[in-house]
């Protein structure tokens, strides 16, 4: 979107680049600019069309340098009135948009410095002009000369004002600091030879040596170290010059610093050493250099994370390999009790996991309260899961209670993580390795039912999952598997075919008597609101929930195929009577049930729910086998 500015009877669109000019103005300046433009529009009379005037080349200084020595007006008034804020802004941006006046002349001191005019500076000094007075940013001409790298001007000012050599700007920057930042080595050397203090820091406590390391300027570092700059000075984060050079993998600078007395075990505010920085950022050459100079390979930060742990977390494989070759301890845990193997499994880095497996203590893993299997399964890292299982990690190691409490469902097994992620392959891997599907507070089978994944359900049931699972925190009088499958009749029938017990659905406490009011929507999803034990929910109560009640008839019809002579309670009868097409269901429930049906139930009960899958092996006619398996319901 552009802003339109009216100029003498015509409009010119200003794009977003020009509009961005105003972003640096304060609210008061914007108001002033609007007033000036409004007054100009009112007083401007009809004139011929203006022509664009080319402006002179605009040399913008890097800083504001108002070397104003007197508040008195100039001897000769300007030829025209000074520009308002609006015209000044637009003039600064482009001379092609508006007719502008000549720009204000550059301060002669700054002009002389930028042009390297030593004679002009000497003349000013001889004329008595004070060049040791700072501007509003605290900058001296000495700072300008160092900033622009004008060695001749710098020497003139040094000789004239030797007491200003270490004077600081408002940002606590010395001329030496500015020369280092701008990498003007001749100015840097001149200042040091003149006695400049090399360890004066800016507001962030960064010294010239630190900035030289930041810019990877080895020659500047060498000069500063030769003039006794403190190689162990710390910035406000506690970082030394060696920390900075290590983070940039600058071996030449590191060599100079260590030769100049830099401590390889210096720690920042988080107890991080240069070697820790090298491992964390994957700087292998720097890491080798520090290890060669005696740095502690097992250094730990304030949160107890080791250099090896950080390298694993950031997946620096070559760094991990080097640290292990130097004897790094893979059994140092961080403050959360996690080992490098844990974080490598979480990241899913197969190669790092393979390197850590032979050197990781199983005892330390058990003490951590969480298995790498949990982390690999949680993040769907199947290759890592296979490696851990091949290394014979206990597939049934539970999460520690304090870690299980971090999950709302209080999960404890690696199998549960795989099922929650609907990862069929990982589920099969864990079950084949001996995972117990009945260890969690909430059965993984219930999660699989919620996902509607028949393959996962079949795997769990084939490996012994309890098909009549209940939820201890939400007690029901009937299996929770039925509760979870009610909204999908084909899924409900699948579970009933496999032996789910439907009898409890028709064992109502209230029978033919009056029932309490139907539950409000969502009751069965809510956690208990007080410390009282939750009441046991009857099947008819759950069926009366608004989101389920419209399926009451078909649900009862399916369940009746898997139970014998049962009595429908008054609430179930109400549901059936609410829709005339369901009358046949009520008739179906009337005892006695067909003898063939009762015999089928008797045979299935004798076989047992865990052996239902073996029905095909019975020495019976195929037609009878199909009847027992509910493949022929006629």
From Swiss-Prot:
Gene Ontology molecular function terms on file: cullin family protein binding
Disulfide partners: none
Location of region: Disordered: 35-81
Pfam family, one: Ank_4
SMART domains, A to Z: ANK, SOCS, SOCS_box
Main subcellular localisation: cytoplasm
GO biological process: actin cytoskeleton organization; cardiac muscle cell development; cardiac muscle cell differentiation; heart development; heart looping; intracellular signal transduction; proteasome-mediated ubiquitin-dependent protein catabolic process; protein ubiquitination
One GO term describing the cellular component: stress fiber
Parts of the chain that traverse the membrane: none
Annotated ranges, domain UIM: 26-45
Ranges of biased composition (kind: Polar residues): 49-60
UniProt keyword annotations, A-Z: ANK repeat, Cytoplasm, Cytoskeleton, Phosphoprotein, Repeat, Ubl conjugation, Ubl conjugation pathway
Sequence ranges of the ANK repeats: 104-133, 137-167, 171-200, 204-233, 237-266, 270-299, 303-332, 336-365, 368-397, 410-439, 440-469, 476-504
Self-association and partners: Component of a probable ECS E3 ubiquitin-protein ligase complex which contains CUL5, either RBX1 or RNF7/RBX2, Elongin BC complex (ELOB and ELOC) and ASB2. Interacts with SKP2. Through its interaction with SKP2, likely to bridge the formation of dimeric E3-ubiquitin-protein ligase complexes composed of an ECS complex and an SCF(SKP2) complex. Interacts with JAK2; the interaction targets JAK2 for Notch-mediated proteasomal degradation. Interacts with TCF3/E2A; the interaction is mediated by SKP2 and targets TCF3 for Notch-mediated proteasomal degradation. Interacts with DES.
Family classification: Belongs to the ankyrin SOCS box (ASB) family.
Function: Substrate-recognition component of a SCF-like ECS (Elongin-Cullin-SOCS-box protein) E3 ubiquitin-protein ligase complex which mediates the ubiquitination and subsequent proteasomal degradation of target proteins. Mediates Notch-induced ubiquitination and degradation of substrates including E2A and JAK2. Required during embryonic heart development for complete heart looping. Required for cardiomyocyte differentiation. Involved in myogenic differentiation and targets filamin FLNB for proteasomal degradation but not filamin FLNA. Also targets DES for proteasomal degradation.
Domain comment, as recorded: The SOCS box domain mediates the interaction with the Elongin BC complex, an adapter module in different E3 ubiquitin-protein ligase complexes.
PANTHER family: ANK_REP_REGION DOMAIN-CONTAINING PROTEIN (PTHR24126:SF14), ANKYRIN REPEAT, PH AND SEC7 DOMAIN CONTAINING PROTEIN SECG-RELATED (PTHR24126)
Name listed for the protein in its UniProt record: Ankyrin repeat and SOCS box protein 2
Organismal lineage: Eukaryota, Metazoa, Chordata, Craniata, Vertebrata
């Amino acid at each position: 979107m552009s802003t339109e500015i009216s100029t003498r009877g015509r409009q010119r669109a200003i794009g977003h680049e020009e509009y961005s000019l105003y972003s640096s103005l304060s609210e008061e300046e914007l108001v002033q600019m609007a007033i000036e433009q409004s007054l100009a529009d009112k007083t401007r009379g009809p004139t011929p069309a203006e022509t664009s005037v080319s402006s002179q080349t605009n040399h913008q200084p890097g800083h504001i340098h108002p070397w104003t020595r007197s508040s008195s007006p100039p001897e000769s008034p300007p030829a025209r009135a000074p520009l308002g804020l609006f015209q000044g802004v637009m003039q600064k941006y482009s001379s092609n948009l508006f007719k502008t006046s000549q720009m204000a002349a550059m301060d002669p001191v700054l002009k002389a410095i930028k042009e390297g005019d030593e004679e002009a500076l000497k003349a000013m000094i001889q004329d008595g002009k004070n060049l040791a007075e700072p501007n509003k940013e605290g900058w001296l001409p000495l700072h300008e000369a160092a900033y622009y790298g004008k060695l001749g001007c710098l020497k003139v000012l040094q000789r004239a004002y030797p007491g200003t050599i270490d004077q600081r700007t408002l940002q606590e920057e010395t001329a030496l600091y500015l020369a280092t930042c701008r990498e003007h080595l001749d100015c840097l050397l001149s200042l040091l030879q003149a006695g400049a203090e090399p360890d004066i820091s800016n507001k962030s406590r960064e010294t010239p040596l630190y900035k030289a390391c930041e810019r990877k300027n080895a020659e500047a570092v060498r000069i500063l170290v030769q003039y006794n700059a403190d190689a162990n000075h710390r910035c406000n984060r506690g970082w030394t010059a060696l920390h900075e050079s290590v983070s940039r993998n600058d071996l030449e600078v590191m060599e100079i610093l260590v030769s100049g007395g830099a401590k390889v075990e210096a720690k920042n505010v988080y107890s991080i050493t240069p070697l820790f920085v090298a491992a964390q950022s994957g700087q292998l050459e720097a890491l080798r250099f520090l290890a060669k100079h005696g740095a502690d390979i097992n250094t730990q930060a304030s949160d107890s994370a080791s250099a090896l742990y950080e390298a694993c977390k950031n997946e620096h494989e070559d760094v991990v390999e080097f640290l292990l070759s130097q004897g790094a301890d893979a059994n140092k845990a961080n403050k959360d009790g996690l080992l490098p193997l844990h974080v490598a499994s979480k990241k899913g880095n197969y190669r790092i996991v393979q390197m850590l497996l032979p050197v990781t203590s199983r005892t330390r893993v058990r003490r951590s309260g969480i298995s790498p299997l949990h982390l690999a399964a949680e993040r769907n890292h199947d290759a890592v899961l296979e490696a851990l299982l091949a290394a014979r990690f206990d597939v049934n190691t539970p999460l520690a209670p304090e870690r299980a409490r971090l999950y709302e469902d209080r999960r404890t097994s690696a199998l549960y993580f795989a099922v929650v992620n609907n990862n069929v392959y990982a589920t099969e891997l864990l079950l084949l390795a001996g995972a117990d599907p009945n260890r969690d507070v909430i059965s993984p089978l219930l999660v699989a039912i919620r996902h509607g994944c028949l393959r996962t359900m079949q795997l769990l049931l084939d490996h012994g999952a309890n098909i009549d699972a209940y939820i201890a925190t939400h007690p029901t009088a009937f299996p929770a598997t039925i509760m979870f499958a009610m909204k999908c009749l084909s899924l409900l029938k699948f579970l009933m075919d496999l032996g789910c017990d439907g009898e409890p659905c028709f064992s109502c406490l209230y029978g033919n008597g009056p029932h309490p009011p139907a539950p409000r929507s969502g009751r069965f999803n809510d956690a208990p609101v007080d410390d009282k034990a939750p009441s046991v929910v009857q099947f008819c109560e759950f069926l009366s929930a608004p989101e389920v009640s419209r399926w009451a008839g078909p649900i009862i019809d399916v369940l009746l195929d898997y139970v014998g002579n049962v009595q429908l309670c008054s609430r179930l009868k109400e549901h059936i009577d609410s829709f005339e097409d369901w009358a046949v269901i009520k008739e179906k429930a009337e005892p006695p049930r067909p003898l063939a049906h009762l015999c089928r139930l008797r045979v299935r009960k004798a076989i047992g729910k865990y052996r239902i899958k073996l029905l095909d092996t019975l020495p019976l006619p195929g037609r009878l086998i199909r009847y027992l398996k509910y493949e022929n319901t006629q």
